[in-house]
Amino acid sequence: KSSAADTPRMDREGFTAAPIAAAGKLLVGQSKGDAGTRGWIAALDIETGEEVWRQYTVPAPGEFGNETWADDHGAWKTGGGSLWTTGSYDAEQRLTIWGTAQPVPMFDPEFRPGDNLFTNSAMAWDIDTGALKYYFQYTPNESWDYDENGVHMLIDAPFNGVDRKT
């Protein structure tokens, strides 16, 4: 008997979203979370191809958000959170914003109790450092395969009489 965790990681990763070229970097998102791996985004140097930073959408122990994977068997290791669709880039704020998919296994929320951050979320990362700037989780402990796969439209909109970036 084997599990997704026993299969080499590279055999379980893939890409469906087009990359974003911005600020001298190529932003790519891993999108094969249904195969039992954690989603991630990476920035590659356009000239050298070297990885500048990588951030996972499902946090490991000790990282912010891992406490929302409230199990005793390491469900975060195969947690999902893929980036199915190309994100957005805000050049002025130097942010890239992407939507993440459901947690895995998707139809077994009891295997992965808790909110399962940062699955089914909008996530914004600093393009230079990869630091998470903000997030919003649409459906905690999502088990219906909703995903957050829409492209985030970035606009200036009035709020209480003041234009705000939204």
Predicted regions: what they are:
Residues 1-10, 40-77, 110-148, 153-163:
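Extracytoplasmic/lumenal domain signature
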Residues 11-35, 75-105, 109-111, 121, ...:
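Repeat-blade elements of multi-bladed beta-propeller folds
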